[in-house]
Amino acid sequence: MGILNKIFGTYSERELRRVNPIVNKIEALDEKMQSLKDEDFKLKTEEFKSRLEKGEKLDDILPEAFALVREASHRTIGLKHYREQLIGGVVLHQGRIGEMKTGEGKTLVATLPAYVNALTGKGVHIVTVNDYLAKRDRDLMAPVYEFLGLKVGVILHNLNNEERQEAYGSDITYGTNSEFGFDYLRDNMVVYKEERVQRKLNFSIVDEVDSILIDEARTPLIISGQGEKSTEFYKVADYFTKSLIAEKDFTIDEKANSAMLTDEGVNKAENFFKVDNYADAENMEIQHHVVQALKANYVMKKDKDYMIKDGEILIVDEFTGRAMEGRRYSDGLHQAIEAKEGVRVERESKTLATITYQNYFRMYNKLSGMTGTAQTEENEFREIYGLDVIVIPTHEPIARIDNADVVYKSEKGKFKAIVDEIVERYKKGQPMLVGTVSIEKSEMLSSMLKKKGVPHQVLNAKYHEKEAEIISHAGEYGMVTIATNMAGRGTDIKLTKEAEEAGGLMIIGTERHESRRIDNQLRGRSGRQGDPGESRFFVSLEDDLMRIFGSERIQGIVDKLGLAEDEAIESKMVSSAIESAQKKVEGNNFDIRKTLLQYDDVINKQREIIYKQRSEVLEGEDLKDQIRDMIRDVAYTAVNSHVSGVEEEFETELQNLVNYLEDICLPKALVKVKDISNLSDEEIKEKLLEAVENIYSNKEKEIGEEQIREIERVILLRVVDTKWMDHIDDMDHLKQGIGLRAYRQQDPVQAYQFEGSEMFEEMIYNIKVDTVRYLFHVEVEKAPEREKVAKETSTNYDEDSVKKQPIKKENRIGRNDMCPCGSGKKYKNCCGRMA
């Protein structure tokens, strides 16, 4: 590969050769654009729009349009795109990912493709990771767009419906990934089409694309309503779990981030909860609470995974170190942590709507993204999103010196060395940014520096509000900043002259992250636009990455060398062992995300069908034929499922059939068994259908055609929403247990696809039954009103981006279990058919 790259250049270099002629054309138009009067810019926009209407393509007008934006930017905000930024703009317009280093002006680059694609009138979404950046970028760039005659909006967390509609109606809309995703879900929960806020998803430019499409790919967006479960059981399970002894009663699997009972622990559980067989399906509720209590007590760490503020448990995001207000772990884990910490236990919630970022962003006609670090995940971008990564050259060569890692035997020795390094560099006034992996480590390092008399600022989840301000001072002379992970991402660190002379920004990594990309992001904070700078990572064999995934070979070498606690080794072999541990974890995480996507694709197809049906109802389409089809389907299916063809049971079956239909759509005693006992199955179907259709026609005359059509819409919406919400829970329940199929030599994904589609078909049939039942029983006293079947109480995000697992609902009768009515048939062939 290396030799081929030397001869032909890397993939990015080859692709950039194709982009260069376009950029040459843009630069050649510079003089022409400078000669335009200010009022000509809006006229040029109108001219481009009319050329597109006459059949020209975006690529035909691109050089002139880019040159126009470049000049508009220069006149309004004093910034002129340089060549590398024009290259970045072309790459984004082509629906690719541009890897642009920190400080290369990604915010300005986005104006080029955003303007060109907004000319179609279909809207452009520019996506950032938090509200602060969305508003900042909109405010910075709005003068450019408005000078060109385009309208620009921003979606913020606290906007009402009207404000959202206005923002989405703009040519270009800034906002966060979670707001865009939640608005899509809410639009598919409205009961009147006028309440929708989004237009069709057209073109999206995702800033920090790796953070949104990879780090958060495992996170579904979830809109929740109030659940029904009691909270007492969490306290009981917590009390039981605290009585257990590690290794003897339970084991912890750090790689899987889980804990499980041993045989001895199971015996204790059976005695404590007074059950005969802990593993029995009827004890699922107990198992669920114990598993979550184990995880809360022995896997989840305070001040690393979560923190307590004003008697509330707040999740700490592992990627940014931020506390996530208003966000909760699902599946009862949050309640288990509340019980562990002795704060008030809130009720579990019920999922009303959910989608993953992977499936949300794949709905755009065209998708592109920018980040400082994408190349390490190039395969994933290509395989899952169909996006390739092009490395954009930097405007100035990178002058940062990246030193080799130093490895210590113990964490104590490592932190002592870090403090010594900080003290040494502080003396000469060099600014430092120290990256830590948790609040706990930040605070430990902070107290060590206080003892040494080194003034410093700390940036972690507890000081989230001051984030941008703190990080903007990090490049000043003698400034020491301790930050959890990637806090402050999106804010440039500018050096003062004295700081530059002192060697520029020194980056100190206190631990290797499991992803090389996160390490590269930390490094990339230094050396922006050719600034001087330096970086080094300090590693110990007690760090999580080395302990869980590192090789025993390194431990062997350290033991042979007989290293003291505060002695370090620097060697190529150690660095490559660290990198291979990281690659191992990255590969593992990619596989997990790929598998999750296979699962999510099943419910995604189902979601599309349901949302399409809802949309047709909202658009006011006449449902008359659809309702007639439902009536026929319910009547015919009832005959097929009740009449077996066994002569001795024929009379009984017909009586059951009549009883069943009387419950749904037949008035009592209208059809008697003796009226149909001499007919064939087909004749029975026709007779019943005729009776039911006549009743519905009379109802239509009685209520009035216009009114019955609206009643049909109201009822169908309500039934679809109720069934869909239960189905989301059922599918999640199926997914939780599907992994065990591997023990039966079954492919879990295939089993999930097969059973999930069976469950979906069943749900569709149940929608028909309930819709028909409600329509035949409806009594109209006043005009029907549409209302939501469940009220949204929360989402799993605040205005920042973080991760969360789906929600699960327990104790449903399995489709293949025996029916509880005592018929001796399987549930799916008996009452489950009509449930």
From Swiss-Prot:
Catalytic activity annotation: ATP + H2O + cellular proteinSide 1 = ADP + phosphate + cellular proteinSide 2
Cofactor field: Zn(2+)
Cofactor note text: May bind 1 zinc ion per subunit.
Residue intervals passing through the bilayer: none
A Pfam family annotated for this UniProt entry: SecA_PP_bind
One CC-aspect GO term: cell envelope Sec protein transport complex
GO molecular function: ATP binding; metal ion binding; protein-exporting ATPase activity
InterPro entries hit by this protein: Helicase_ATP-bd, Helicase_C-like, P-loop_NTPase, SEC_C_motif, SecA, SecA_CS, SecA_DEAD, SecA_motor_DEAD
Main location: membrane
Localization per record: Cell membrane; Cytoplasm
Keyword Metal-binding: yes
EC numbers for this chain: 7.4.2.8
GO biological process entries: intracellular protein transmembrane transport; protein import; protein targeting; protein transport by the Sec complex
Membrane topology field: Peripheral membrane protein
Keyword tags: ATP-binding, Cell membrane, Cytoplasm, Membrane, Metal-binding, Nucleotide-binding, Protein transport, Translocase, Translocation, Transport, Zinc
Residues that coordinate or bind Zn(2+): 819, 821, 830-831
Binding site for ATP: 85, 103-107, 492
Function: Part of the Sec protein translocase complex. Interacts with the SecYEG preprotein conducting channel. Has a central role in coupling the hydrolysis of ATP to the transfer of proteins into and across the cell membrane, serving as an ATP-driven molecular motor driving the stepwise translocation of polypeptide chains across the membrane.
Membership in a protein family: Belongs to the SecA family.
Entry-linked HAMAP family: SecA (MF_01382)
Subunit structure: Monomer and homodimer. Part of the essential Sec protein translocation apparatus which comprises SecA, SecYEG and auxiliary proteins SecDF. Other proteins may also be involved.
Protein's name according to its UniProt entry: Protein translocase subunit SecA
Originating species: Clostridium botulinum (strain Loch Maree / Type A3)
Gene designation per UniProt: secA
